[in-house]
Curated annotation (Swiss-Prot):
Keywords, comma-separated and alphabetical: Acetylation, Calcium, Repeat
Source superkingdom: Eukaryota
UniProt modified residues of type N-acetylalanine: A2
Family: Belongs to the calmodulin family.
Provenance organism: Tetrahymena thermophila
Record function comment: Calmodulin mediates the control of a large number of enzymes, ion channels and other proteins by Ca(2+). Among the enzymes to be stimulated by the calmodulin-Ca(2+) complex are a number of protein kinases and phosphatases.
Stated name of the protein: Calmodulin
Keyword set includes DNA-binding: no
Note from the entry: This protein has four functional calcium-binding sites.
Domain EF-hand: from-to ranges: 8-13
Amino acid sequence: MADQLTEEQIAEF
């Protein structure tokens, strides 16, 4: 699902 999140959003996780 990483493809659906931006690098900024991934940083939160």
